[in-house]
Amino acid sequence: MRHLILGAALALMLPLSAQAQDAGDAAAGEKAFAPCKACHAFGKNGVGPDLKGVVGRKAGVHEGYNYSAALKGSGITWDEANLKEWLKDPKAKVPGNKMVYPGLKDDKKLADVIAYLGTQK
């Protein structure tokens, strides 16, 4: 009986460990974000739009930036899943967008950057 209870407890913990692995590290994300600073900032538009408060924001609506028609019409809200797809391959996520970034293919760095973006409110 003890083995059955232990097995059930371990089985219940597996989803929690998977979530912990998916959670990004904001400090590592700040470092991974460094190349993005060539176009993006927090609190002002640059070559790319202002990313302050981007998590949870609708795509293509930040005031003062000239977005592509494709991004404006995408209907995307920048949640974790959409940010992951976008940062991995912007041209595949929204064909016709203006972002020239080829994408970040490393899933750990993606999670870290998204965690970092989430701290920029």
Predicted features along the sequence, with ranges:
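The canonical Cys-X-X-Cys-His
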Residues: 29, 33-42, 113
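Positively charged n-region of N-terminal signal peptides that target proteins for export
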Residues: 1-4
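C-terminal capping alpha-helices of c-type cytochrome domains
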Residues: 79-121
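Electrostatic cytochrome c docking/interface patches
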Residues: 16-33, 73
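Short Fe-S-cluster ligation motifs
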Residues: 63-84
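His/Cys-centered metal/cofactor-coordination and adjacent catalytic loops
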Residues: 21-23, 43, 47-54
